[in-house]
Amino acid sequence: VQPEYTVATSDGIRNGTKEMRYSLIGREVTNDTLCEHLSASGLEGTIAVVACDKPPVGTLSAILEHNRPAIIMSDGPIRPGIDSVTNEPLDIISSYQIAGSEDEELKRRIACEACPGYGSCGGMFTYNTMQTFIGVVGMQPLHMVSPPSDDKRRLDVFPDQLITYLDNMVKKDIKPRDIV
């Protein structure tokens, strides 16, 4: 499922703002959008790549509702960073912990260095919890849950594996509700 077929709100971007109130309804919006797309497309099978907090839940519920062969892969979490001054490891929690500081330069440095790359949330919050859950219930291969977003396997290995898994599911008529 290509990203343009779903709408999502990022908790990480909205956190602490008045727009955060739109976050939870993002699950339903993703579900509704994906259900409409899957129902209208006539696809025999679906590979859904999900990111951020709410799309995994909305996607899983749509796939279960639609009940045609499908598999999910997350985009992977962002890697932690290194503080350029202290050489100590940093992560998303580091940004939260320093938020109350009056040192604006320190806050900016930590915010920029704590999550230096790309990927979904690097903490054990909704995103990683849901990816683990989706893997445990059998809708995402477990070895695809935790590698970070920039892990080369996400582009070089996992897509071919997903196609093989989905092809097998289509041939054997294995549907999401048979798995979950």
Description of each model-found segment:
Residues 1-25:
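Anionic-ligand anchoring segments at beta-strand to alpha-helix junctions in alpha/beta enzyme folds, i.e.
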Residues 23-179:
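Active-site cavity-forming subdomains of large catalytic enzyme subunits
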